[in-house]
Every structure is written in structure tokens, then in C-alpha cells.
């Protein structure tokens, strides 16, 4: 993990197209501003983890459904 120190008003770039600016700090919270291309999706970590888990469950369900359908199809061919 790369650790950087920035003050309010200072920025950093990720590649050429993503700029992150420290807007302010209050207590234990840091307010960040992100300038990203329109085709770039930005998620908070907890939301991203939820999306990944939901996608995993959906894929698992799809695979299970496919296996059941294949078994039923195989039984009808007998």
C-alpha cells in the first residue's frame, strides 16, 4: 500500500485522468473530491464489497439453475 500525506486543498493523480483532492477534515473524517472520466465507476468500499458479493451469489444461482436444467434435460432424453 502506498501511503501519501496531503493537506486540505492538495491533490494527487491516479494515472492521467483521475484527480483526488483533499477538501477538508473534520475529526476522524476526511472529505475527498474526485475528478474521474465519465466512464469510470466509483464505489465506496462497503458498497463495492456488497456488489461483488451479490454478483457472486447471482452467478452461483445461475450455475445451480443451469445444472438442474441440464439434469432435467438429460432425464427427458432417456
From Swiss-Prot:
Would I find Transcription among this entry's keywords? Answer: no
What does the entry list under GO cellular component? cytosol
Q: Name one GO biological process term.
A: negative regulation of translational initiation
Could you tell me the superkingdom of the organism this chain comes from? Bacteria
Which terms are listed as keywords in the entry?
Bacterial flagellum biogenesis, Cytoplasm, Repressor, RNA-binding, Translation regulation
- Protein localization: Cytoplasm
User: Which Pfam family is one of those matched by this entry?
Assistant: CsrA
- The yes or no answer to whether the keyword Iron is present is no
Q: Name one GO molecular function term.
A: mRNA 5'-UTR binding
Function, as annotated, reads: A translational regulator that binds mRNA to regulate translation initiation and/or mRNA stability. Usually binds in the 5'-UTR at or near the Shine-Dalgarno sequence preventing ribosome-binding, thus repressing translation. Its main target seems to be the major flagellin gene, while its function is anatagonized by FliW.
HAMAP family from the xrefs? Answer: CsrA
Could you say which protein family the record assigns here?
Answer: Belongs to the CsrA/RsmA family.
Q: Which PANTHER family match?
A: CARBON STORAGE REGULATOR
Subunit info here reads:
Homodimer; the beta-strands of each monomer intercalate to form a hydrophobic core, while the alpha-helices form wings that extend away from the core.
| Name recorded for this polypeptide | Translational regulator CsrA
List the taxonomic lineage.
Bacteria, Pseudomonadati, Thermodesulfobacteriota, Desulfovibrionia, Desulfovibrionales
Amino acid at each position: 500500500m502506498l501511503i501519501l500525506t496531503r493537506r486540505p486543498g492538495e491533490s494527487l493523480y491516479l494515472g492521467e485522468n483521475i484527480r483526488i483532492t483533499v477538501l477538508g477534515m473534520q475529526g476522524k473524517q476526511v472529505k475527498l473530491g474526485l475528478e474521474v472520466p465519465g466512464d469510470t465507476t466509483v464505489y465506496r468500499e462497503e458498497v463495492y464489497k456488497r456488489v461483488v458479493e451479490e454478483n457472486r451469489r447471482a452467478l452461483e444461482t445461475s450455475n445451480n439453475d443451469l445444472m438442474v436444467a441440464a439434469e432435467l434435460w438429460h432425464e427427458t432424453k432417456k
